[in-house]
């Protein structure tokens, strides 16, 4: 078992590479794939999440496309729960419902299978990064529209300057963030 102490969190944070001017000039991109390449950091991340969320009565873990799958699916497996993917339109084969959300320039849409969540489900949402909160806001709306209860969301990285934390807290979500980075 590994605890969420400062040394462990430092290992995780230091494994995340910062790529300047990607995908456009002026952006400091936080590359979670470098964490995945580091067995020690990836395992520490998963161990912390398992320890935090075990025995809390969750019935499903929902992960958002695509990097949320990299943390959500193994977490669900370790917790003995089902994993539900939330995806871009046209990627899920069964009947879906969709939720539109605003981006900095334009909008996007997410979908979930209509039979993946029901009123008996207590759901944990996970994604790699919390920025503006739009993706998770749409994901939570999808889950709640299907009758699921969702009050917890976990992120490996948070960019608090972009306002996502406040946006999601206004939806009555308890947030866990393993690393914070300043800026965009």
Swiss-Prot record:
The record's catalysed reaction(s) read: AMP + diphosphate = 5-phospho-alpha-D-ribose 1-diphosphate + adenine
* Gene3D superfamilies, per the entry: 3.40.50.2020
Enzyme Commission number, as recorded: 2.4.2.7
Keywords, in A-Z order: Cytoplasm, Glycosyltransferase, Purine salvage, Transferase
Q: Where does it live in the cell?
A: Cytoplasm
Q: Which GO terms describe its cellular component?
A: cytosol
Which parts pass through the membrane?
A: none
One term of GO molecular function: adenine phosphoribosyltransferase activity
Part of which pathway?
A: Purine metabolism; AMP biosynthesis via salvage pathway; AMP from adenine: step 1/1
Record PROSITE patterns:
PUR_PYR_PR_TRANSFER
Q: Which GO terms describe its biological process?
A: adenine salvage; AMP salvage; purine ribonucleoside salvage
Q: What does this protein do, in the record's words?
A: Catalyzes a salvage reaction resulting in the formation of AMP, that is energically less costly than de novo synthesis.
Subunit info here reads: Homodimer.
Q: What family does the database annotate? A: Belongs to the purine/pyrimidine phosphoribosyltransferase family.
Q: What is this protein called?
A: Adenine phosphoribosyltransferase
Which source organism does the UniProt entry give? Answer: Shewanella sediminis (strain HAW-EB3)
Give me the gene this protein comes from.
apt
